[in-house]
């Protein structure tokens, strides 16, 4: 595990909304400050864990964007962002997304049948976003080679595997206990 990622998670602020404790971290929220050293470290570790013999990297708007940008620059693999608004482009695929805190639509563009892809996102908690991405990519006829999230918080990995058959790789597993992030693995 990355020492930078681990230390930054252990010291990140926790905000309580209702009964849920949110951890506020540069990788998952873009605040308080995204240090280039942390982003470089995370993207380097991602590259070592994913299949790089792919045509495209796919992420959902918004916080996967800095990570896929760094990975794309380092690997020369182009990326696609599933957006929260439609563009009405030919072949656009809408898919419903439900997470633990929101519902909405995501829209997939730029994927062709047979494209080999890696899915990359910042955090997995409920698995709702990844299930939506996988479903959209299957509808597009993409060949999903890897699924990776930087931070695992919750039961989302199991949900994704049960609903889609895909295993989700992660860099670190955490939980929030007594107002602090605990590193589990």
UniProtKB/Swiss-Prot annotation:
One of its GO terms (cellular component) is cytoplasm. Pathway: Purine metabolism; IMP biosynthesis via salvage pathway; IMP from hypoxanthine: step 1/1. Its EC number is 2.4.2.8. The keyword Chloroplast does not apply. The keyword Methyltransferase does not apply. It is found in: Cytoplasm. One of its GO terms (biological process) is IMP salvage. Keywords: Cytoplasm, Glycosyltransferase, Purine salvage, Transferase. It catalyses: IMP + diphosphate = hypoxanthine + 5-phospho-alpha-D-ribose 1-diphosphate; GMP + diphosphate = guanine + 5-phospho-alpha-D-ribose 1-diphosphate. It comes from the Archaea. SUPFAM superfamilies: PRTase-like. GO terms for molecular function: guanine phosphoribosyltransferase activity; hypoxanthine phosphoribosyltransferase activity. Pfam families: Pribosyltran (PF00156). It is an enzyme of class 2 (transferase). Homodimer. Catalyzes a salvage reaction resulting in the formation of IMP that is energically less costly than de novo synthesis. Belongs to the purine/pyrimidine phosphoribosyltransferase family. Archaeal HPRT subfamily. This is Hypoxanthine/guanine phosphoribosyltransferase.
